[in-house]
Amino acid sequence: YPFAPEFYDLCDSLGFYVSNEIFDEWNRGQEWGYSESSYGKMPYTYHLYFDQWGETDLRRMIRRDRNHPCVALYVLGNEIPNQRIQGIEIAQKLKAITREEDPTRPVTAACDFFVGANIYGFMDQFDIAGYNYIDRIHPDSLYAAEHARYPNRILLGTETYHKTRNHVSIRDNASAIGEFVWVGYDYLGEIVWPDYRGWDEGMLDIAGFPKPEYYLRKSYWSDEPVVHIGVRQGPDRDFDWSPRNVADHWNWQGRDQDTLEVYAYSNCDEVELRIGRRSLGRKPVGRDDYYALWNVPFKAGTISATGYRQGKKVAEHRLLTAGKPYAVKVSRIFRYDDVIRVELCVVDKEGIRIPDSEAEITPGNIPSERLLGFDNGNQYDPQGLKYASAERGRCSGGRMVVYLKPDSAA
């Protein structure tokens, strides 16, 4: 990072704010991190070159990106080891360079050692105080605790867990301006190969399919009425970055004797749950939870959630039990200048996706020179991502993506 120029063009057109970040090391190297190495990040990293290249790289980034309206602020370091007194002089220098190149935007640093950074005065060097995982220190009061101590600060969650309490604390504290959740989109890396191929705790999987967590976040942020069903499929992972372990399908054969936790993620006033035609009643949506919860027995058929605002039906989500695999369906196609994204799913006779299908699919009538690759979004499947040399791809959750060159590019 920083990202490619095309990323900023896209954010400009879509209306996204960008926290333009540079450096995860200054002149001290990291001593930890996720990698194949037992001692963390590899030793030959940017701290060896910061004194020579830091100013040059910062100026080049700002000059390249400062005319993009999407750029909201600059982040001069993420979890750098210099969050102590020895980092203050460097912070002042980097901030002065940033002001010289762009006096219009605020600067921050993403601090995971913010207790020490407060004590040493490191966080006072920036326009905005950036906190990574504030609930590690303030699990109950979060941003309210920091505001009480530093009432004149602007606070920002520069990196946060998925936990709803982070959003609620920002929502209810005017001094906290927002959060950057780790992470929105699954990605390759930060793993121990070959157990899995990348980080899988995002709101969307690496193939771009939304997970139930996506709709919980949409409930936080959207004015549009939202309701989405998620069924607990097992215990939550003992991992702080993991969202709730739910799935949005209604194929639980073999668990007919179990009581299932059914979440209806929503920003409506209340939600009504139905199994088949039988109503299980309406429940209020918790203001600080953004869901209503039922414990219900599994019965094959249909489960539906209806959201109400001021007594009026405004949103609905249904899940149907799928039967036997019958066909492969093209669910969506996205066409871009240099790539076509085709979403495929395995469906039954009624067109319902088969959520446990791992079928292998060979695209028919497509010249091999147009095929770019396949992805099923499953980070634990070593065959989940295949490139152009592969003739077929494997589904996960009954779906996959095929990437093609347009006719003119073949």
Feature map (PLM): residue ranges:
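Short aromatic-acidic-glycine turn motif
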Residues: 283, 326-327, 363-382
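Active-site mouth of glycoside hydrolases
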Residues: 1-140, 149-152, 160, 165
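Acidic/polar low-complexity surface segments
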Residues: 97, 106, 375-391
